Amino acid sequence: MKRPATRTFGILTSGGDCPGLNAAIRGVTKAAYWRYGMSIIGISHGYRGLIEGDARLLHPRDFDGILTRGGTILGTSREKPFKPDPGEKDSEAGSRKVEAIIENYHKLHLDCLVVLGGNGTHKTAYLLQQAGLNVIGLPKTIDNDIWGTDVTFGFHSAVDIATEAIDRLHSTAHAHNRVMVIEVMGHKAGWLALYAGIAGGGDIILIPEIPYDLAHIVHHLQTRQQRGKEFSIVVVAEGALSREESLMSKEERKKRRKKNRFPTKGYEVAHLIQEATGMETRVTVLGYLQRGGTPSPYDRLLATRFGTAAAELLYRGDYGKMVALRDGEVVAIPLGEVAEKLKTVPPDHPLIDTARAVGTCFGDGV
Amino acid sequence: MKRPATRTFGILTSGGDCPGLNAAIRGVTKAAYWRYGMSIIGISHGYRGLIEGDARLLHPRDFDGILTRGGTILGTSREKPFKPDPGEKDSEAGSRKVEAIIENYHKLHLDCLVVLGGNGTHKTAYLLQQAGLNVIGLPKTIDNDIWGTDVTFGFHSAVDIATEAIDRLHSTAHAHNRVMVIEVMGHKAGWLALYAGIAGGGDIILIPEIPYDLAHIVHHLQTRQQRGKEFSIVVVAEGALSREESLMSKEERKKRRKKNRFPTKGYEVAHLIQEATGMETRVTVLGYLQRGGTPSPYDRLLATRFGTAAAELLYRGDYGKMVALRDGEVVAIPLGEVAEKLKTVPPDHPLIDTARAVGTCFGDGV
Amino acid sequence: MKRPATRTFGILTSGGDCPGLNAAIRGVTKAAYWRYGMSIIGISHGYRGLIEGDARLLHPRDFDGILTRGGTILGTSREKPFKPDPGEKDSEAGSRKVEAIIENYHKLHLDCLVVLGGNGTHKTAYLLQQAGLNVIGLPKTIDNDIWGTDVTFGFHSAVDIATEAIDRLHSTAHAHNRVMVIEVMGHKAGWLALYAGIAGGGDIILIPEIPYDLAHIVHHLQTRQQRGKEFSIVVVAEGALSREESLMSKEERKKRRKKNRFPTKGYEVAHLIQEATGMETRVTVLGYLQRGGTPSPYDRLLATRFGTAAAELLYRGDYGKMVALRDGEVVAIPLGEVAEKLKTVPPDHPLIDTARAVGTCFGDGV
Amino acid sequence: MKRPATRTFGILTSGGDCPGLNAAIRGVTKAAYWRYGMSIIGISHGYRGLIEGDARLLHPRDFDGILTRGGTILGTSREKPFKPDPGEKDSEAGSRKVEAIIENYHKLHLDCLVVLGGNGTHKTAYLLQQAGLNVIGLPKTIDNDIWGTDVTFGFHSAVDIATEAIDRLHSTAHAHNRVMVIEVMGHKAGWLALYAGIAGGGDIILIPEIPYDLAHIVHHLQTRQQRGKEFSIVVVAEGALSREESLMSKEERKKRRKKNRFPTKGYEVAHLIQEATGMETRVTVLGYLQRGGTPSPYDRLLATRFGTAAAELLYRGDYGKMVALRDGEVVAIPLGEVAEKLKTVPPDHPLIDTARAVGTCFGDGV
C-alpha cells in the first residue's frame, strides 16, 4: 500500500457521552497513524473546542489504555454552531461560530474533520461539509436512532445496563408483589426499551412508536394476576405516548404535561396503574446510569470497526460520509442521506412480534 | 451432639426486601434441619402471612439454589401488626392482628418464630416476645442502621451497587465537565452514602448526621475547579439535612418541603448547586436498584453465618435474641436492647476522617 | 389466527451447555403454549433422555424465571445415538438407541422434536429426520461455528466473559511487565478468540484458521517493547496451529503433542514465547468459565427470537429446519444444509483487517 | 494542625499485584500532600526500582482516577534484595543490593519509605528498618495471610472474583450432572477457598490447614447423590494437602508430586474423585484472574483507610510500623511482630463451623 502525502485530521466527540467513544477514537487514531502515517489533532469538547481553537497534536500513546474506558478523553459538549444562542434574534452568533470553525479548520491545516456523535452532530457535520470542509462521521448514541446504520455504538452497552437494572427490579417486584415501572432513555425511538424490555423479561413495554391505552395495560396486569403472577415489570421509554397524546400537537402535549405533576413519563404510568388496579406500583428512572461505564465487548468491537473504517476513508480521501453497519458489513453513506432523519422502531419490526409471542404487552391491545 | 425432641419453627421475612434474605433463610433452614432435625414452617409475606395463617411445611430442597438469588422466596410485606391501620381510631385492629398471630403461632405448633428484618421488624418481634411468643431475629437492611450489630446483611451489596453507579457517573461527569449528584438510600443513617461515597471517590458526601451548609459545598466545588478539576461527584443520602433544616422541628421540615418543588433531597441539592455555582449539574436517584439482585459474596457469607447462628439459638432454646456481628464475632443480643434504637454514623467515625483525608467534603466546613 | 388441532412437541438440549439455553426453551414453550395452544413434553439430558424415555408434560409455569439463568433446566448430555459406544464392534448399539428414540417419539405422541444444540446435535437431528421423525433445530454454541447462521446464542455471552478475563489480565500484565497468554475455547473455529481478542485489546491473536510462525510473534513483541510497551496480551484459541502443524496430518499432530509436555496450546505458546524472548510469560486457561452464568442481554434476545421462531415453524408444520440469523433476519434452513458443515473464520473476514489496523498480530507476518 | 517541616517519602509496591494497590497509593499520597504538605517520590517496580534509582517526584494529579484501577501505576517486582540471586555463592549480591537501596534512600533525601506488599515485602521492610531506614508498611495480598491484621486489601476482591467463577460453574455442573473442581490461590493459607467456598455454596472445600482424606470426599459426594443432587462443586486451595501429604517432609512431597503427572492440586483432586466415584469430573484453575481488575468497594475503602492511616504515621514520624485492621479499627503494629509470621486459618475458626452447618465437607470426616 502506497502511503499518501502525510495527512492531518482533527477529531472531536459531540453530544451526550456514551460507551465506546474512546474505543472509536482509539480505532481511528491507531489505524490512521500506524497504518497510514497521518497526523492527529485532538479537539476538546466537541464543536465548542473547534470554535475556540482548543486543539492539540496527539500521538497514539495518548490513547493507550482507553479501549475499556467510559466517557471520552476529548470531552464533549452539546454546542450546535449553526443554531443561534437563546435570546439572539437572528443567526449572527451562528454564523460567527461557523466562521470560527472554518478559520480554525484551516489554521490547524486539517485535511478532514472526524466527528463522533448522534443526529445533531451529523446534521452539523453535513452543514460544515456544505460549507466546504471535509468531514467524516461516526454514529454513536445509546438511542440507536441514527438513520442509515443498523446499529450505533453505545446502544448495546446501554441495553446491558438497562437489562441488569430490570433484573434487579425483578427480585424486588417478586418479593413485594409489586408492579415495578422502569423508565429508560428514548425520546422519539423506543429501541432501548424494546431490547432491554425483551432481554429483561418485561411484561409490558411502552415505546413512542406504539401509542398505548391504559385499559390494555390494566387488562394485561389483571390477566397476569389471575394466572398467579402477582408482580409485573413495566419498561417505559421516556418518550412513550398514550393514544390520546399521540393525536395531540406538540404544543398541546406540552401544555398537558405542565398541568400534570409527573416529573417524567414513568411516574405518570406508575401513578395511573396504581390508581386503576390498586396494585402497589413503584417507579425507577434509570437516567444517566445508561450512559456511563466501560463499553460492552460488542460496542468495543463495533466502535473499533467504525474507527478503522473511518481511517480508511481518510486515507482514500472519501469525505462527506458517515460509516455505518448494514447487514453485518461496514459501509460509508453520504452525510446528506443521514442528516435530518431519524430511525425509529417500525411497527412491524420482528422483535415486536417476538416480544408478543412470549406474552409481552405493548399497551395497544394486539 | 444429642438431638433435642424435634422442634418446629416458623420463618418469615418482613420489611423492604434486600440482598441476602434468601441466603439467610437457607442458612437457618439447612442447619436447623440437617444438624438439629427440626421442622420448618415457611410463612408468606411477613407478619401478614402469620396473621392470615398463610404458612406451609418446607423441606431443605425447597431452598435449593437460593443462595445467589435476590429478593425473598417467602415474600415480604410492611405489615406492622401492633399499629392500627390508617383511619382506625384506636388499636382495635392492632390487637385483632396480634391475637391472630398468637393464635396461628399455636395452631402451627411453633416452638419459635424466626424473623428476618430491619428496625420495624425487630420492634414487632420484641412486642411479640413480650406477648409470650418465642422469637429470634436476624438483622437485614441495606441501611445498616440496626442497633447492636456492627453490620447488617444487605448493606454491602447495596454499597457495591451504589459504588458501581458512582463509577458510571464519573465517566459522564468527566466527559461533560458536570457536577453529578447521586441520591442513595438512608433516611436517618448515612452509612450507605458514606461507604459508597468513599469507595466511589465522591468529592462531596452529605449524610443526615452531619448538617451541611451550601456555602461550604460551593467553596469546595470552586476550589476543585481552580485546581483544574472541572467535574465533581456529590453523594447525597436521601435524609441529608442542611444546618437550617437540622434546627427545625419535623413538622416545619415537612411544611418547608411541601413548599419547595423538589421531589427528593438529591434534586434540591442539585438545583442549589447549579444556581450557586453556574456549573451544569445533574441528578440521579438510585432508588429500588439498591435493593435488588444477587447478594455480594460478603453478604452471602454474613447471611449464612447469621442463619446458622440462629439455628443454634433455636437448638439451645435461647429465644428473645437477635443475632449480631461484633468485632468479627457472631453474638446474640436481647431483642429488648435492639428495639426502638437506631444506629447512626457517629460524627467521629474514623471513616469520616479517612474521607476528609483524601479531600472529601461533608458540607460542614471542616 | 386459527388454532390447529392441538400439537405436542418434545424439547431437549444436547451437547455442552451454554448461556441462553433456558431463554430459548422459554421462548419456544411460551409461544407454543399461549399463542398456538400446543402441549410441551420436556425431555431430560438430551438424546439420552429420549432413548431412556425420561420425559414429562410441562406447563409454561415450569419455565418461570428461567430467562436469566445459565445452564439448562432440562439437563444435557453428549449422547450421540448414531455412534456406537466405544468398544462396540459395529453400530448395533447405535441402531438400538435410534430405535429406542423412534419408539419413544411415538409413545409420547410427539408431532415434532425440538432440539437445541451445536453441530453434533444437528447432525443427529438430520439423521433422525431421515429416519422419519419431524425435527426442528436451534443453534446454540459458544463457538459460533454452526454453518448457516450468522451467529449462535451463547457466543456473545462467552465473548463477554472472555473479554472481562482479558481486562483483568491487563492490569496484572501491566503491573509486572509480563506477557500474559490466555487460552479460550475454539478447536476448529477462532470466532471467540477473534472477537474477545479485539474487544479486550489483545496484542496477538492466534486462531486455527491462520497458522502462526513463532518468529512473527517474537518480532511483534519486541517491536512493542521498543515502543515502550513492556507488556503484552496474547489470546490463543485452543485449536490454534503453527504453520508447521498446519501442514501435518491429524495423526502426526497428535503424536507430536504427546511428545511435548504441554497440557494445552496456551501452555505451549507461553513456553515458546518465554524461551525465545526472555520475557516473563504466564498462561491462563479460561475453560469452563466460558460456558456458565447468566446469558448476556444479546443472547437472551437472540435465544428468545430463535425460540419464538421455532414455535412458529411448529405451528406451520414446517419441519426439518434449523432456525438461523442471516443479515439480521431470522430464517429457517434445511437441516441437510447444516449437517456435516462447519463455519470457520474466513481469512478475509473484515474483523481480521480491523484487528490488524489497530496493531494486532495474527502471527502470520502480514 | 501545625505542619511539620516538609517531609519527603518514597513509595513502592512489591510482590504480586492485587486489587486495591492504586487505591492505597492514592490514599497515602493525597493525605500526605494535601493534609500534611509532604513531598512524594514514586519508585518503580518495587525494591528493584530503589536498587536502580528508578524514582521520580510525583504530584497528586499523577494519581487522578486511579481509585478504581487494577494493578499498580508504580509497577511491581518480586525483587528480594536480601536474598542472593540464584547461582551466587554467598550473599555478596544481596549486600550489594541493600547498599544500593540505602544509598538511593539517602540520595533521594527520603524521610521514610512506604512499602505496599505481602509477607515477603514486610520481611524486607523489617530488615531495612534494622539497617537504619525509616519504613512504613501496608498489608496487601489476595491471600489474607499477613499476620497482625484481620484482613488485607485485595482479599475481598479476590473472594468476589472466585465466587463469581463458582457461580458460573454451578450452572455447568447442574446442566451436566458433573463434579466441578475449582482451584483457587492459597499455598499455605486457605482463606480465599474458605470465603469463596461458602459464598459460592461449595459442597466440598479443601484448605491447607485441614488435611483431607479421599474417602470422606467420596462419601460426601455419594451421600449428595443419594439425596438427588447429581452435581457438586469442590473448591480447592492450591496448597491443600491430603492427610498423607501432611505427614511428609517438604522434600518428600516435592518428590511425590514430580512422580505424579498432575500440573496442580486441583487436577489431582479431580482425577482421584473421578476414579473413585465414576462421576464425570472437570477442573478449572482460576489463576491470574484472581489478581486483576477493579478493586471491590470493600477493598477501595480498606485501602483508602490504610493509606490515610499510613500518611498519619508519616506525619507523626511513627516509623517501623505496618498499618493493620483489628476488630474494625486501624492500628499500627511493629514490623518486627509481622515479619516471618503467617496468618493461617485456625481449625476452630467460626466460618468452618458455619460451612459445616450448611452441609459443606472439608474432607476430614467431621
Swiss-Prot record, chains A, B, C, D:
Residues annotated for substrate binding in this entry: 141-143, 178, 185-187, 238, 282, 288-291
Keywords of the record: ATP-binding, Cytoplasm, Glycolysis, Kinase, Magnesium, Metal-binding, Nucleotide-binding, Transferase
Needed cofactors: Mg(2+)
Enzyme class: transferase
InterPro entries according to UniProt: ATP_PFK, ATP_PFK_prok-type, Phosphofructokinase_dom, Phosphofructokinase_III, PKF_sf
EC number(s) per entry: 2.7.1.11
GO cellular component annotations of the record: 6-phosphofructokinase complex
Record: residues binding ATP: 16, 78-79, 118-121
Compartments where found: Cytoplasm
Region (Disordered): 74-94
Residue positions binding Mg(2+): 119
Biological-process GO terms, alphabetical: canonical glycolysis; fructose 1,6-bisphosphate metabolic process; fructose 6-phosphate metabolic process
Ranges annotated as biased composition (Basic and acidic residues): 77-94
Protein family according to the UniProt entry: Belongs to the phosphofructokinase type A (PFKA) family. Mixed-substrate PFK group III subfamily.
Description of how the protein assembles with itself and partners: Homodimer or homotetramer.
Role of this protein: Catalyzes the phosphorylation of D-fructose 6-phosphate to fructose 1,6-bisphosphate by ATP, the first committing step of glycolysis.
The protein's name in its UniProt record: ATP-dependent 6-phosphofructokinase
The organism of origin for this protein: Spirochaeta thermophila (strain ATCC 49972 / DSM 6192 / RI 19.B1)
